[in-house]
A protein has these predicted regions:
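Alpha/beta enzyme core
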Residues: 1-37, 54-60
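Hydrophobic faces of well-ordered beta-strands that scaffold small-molecule active sites
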Residues: 8-12, 39-43, 65-67
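Conserved, mostly hydrophobic/aromatic
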Residues: 10, 61, 84, 177
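Glycine-rich phosphate-binding active-site loops on the catalytic face of alpha/beta enzymes
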Residues: 12, 60-77
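Active-site beta-loop-alpha junctions enriched in small/polar residues
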Residues: 13-17, 42-48, 70
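Aromatic/hydrophobic pocket-lining residues that form the small-molecule binding cavity
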Residues: 24, 50, 103
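C-terminal helical cap(s) of enzyme catalytic domains, especially alpha/beta-barrels
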Residues: 73-99
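A mid-to-C-terminal "edge-of-domain" accessory segment
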Residues: 92-223
Length: 223
């Protein structure tokens, strides 16, 4: 094939998604050394390593990465395009021209077309990526997010958010009161609000909506 093709590039394909990053690096170097041709890498995510193996391939000299937006693809999906983009840009210092703030719009459109929802905790795209429930260091969420997060929320068109739930503390309640324009509260009221917030969070096994918190505030103030 090399002699009679001849190919423009060589694709290394991990169809079953079972190659380790170390194995992929070895294969890229070996094939590149043997052929002298550009290398393309195509992986699947059966072991959750699709992005890791493609990043490893790039460090070994691969010039082309195959990916799918939202990590879609057969079975467990292909390497997630948005994760590769941010990884190459932020972790490996590649100078790219990508408009990262457009990723949420693209992801939402594709999710609707494919009828596959985006998990709240999905890297890069998840709605919960920049949420802080614990009361520890919540001031950084809004004012210095890189203290708390691996990427700045604004890079991908998002913002930090404080939510209330079973792990919240008084500081979170105070912050939420201010954010929603609900004024201040006495210490005993704060303690009661926090108790009720935790009760609701435990009961629903999720964080509270602003409407649920408003109901708690009104109930506590009403006595």
């Amino acid at each position: 094939v090399l002699n009679e093709g001849p190919p423009d590039s060589i694709g290394i394909v991990d169809t079953m998604g079972c190659a380790t990053p170390e194995a992929i690096k070895y294969m890229v170097r070996w094939v590149k050394g043997m052929t002298g041709l550009p290398i393309e890498i195509h992986t699947h995510n059966d072991f959750g390593m699709g992005v890791a193996t493609e990043l490893a391939a790039v460090t070994a000299g691969a010039e082309v990465v195959h990916s799918c937006a939202n990590g879609l693809g057969e079975r467990t999906g292909n390497a997630a395009m948005e994760e590769l983009m941010l990884g190459l840009h932020l972790l490996y210092g590649y100078d790219t021209n990508y408009k990262f703030d457009k990723l949420p719009e693209l992801a939402a459109m594709l999710s609707a077309i494919a009828n596959i929802p985006i998990a709240r905790n999905k890297p890069v795209l998840g709605s919960g990526n920049f949420i802080r429930e614990s009361g520890i260091a919540i001031q950084y969420v809004m004012h210095d997010p890189l203290v708390m997060f691996g990427t700045h929320p604004a890079l991908t068109g998002k913002s930090g958010e404080v939510m209330l739930g079973k792990k919240s503390g008084k500081a979170s309640v105070v912050y939420k009161l201010g954010e929603l324009g609900l004024g201040e509260a006495e210490d005993d009221q704060l303690a009661e609000m926090l108790t009720r917030v935790k009760q609701v969070g435990i009961a629903k096994r999720d964080m509270l909506s602003d409407a649920e918190f408003r109901e708690i505030v009104d109930a506590v103030r009403a006595g």
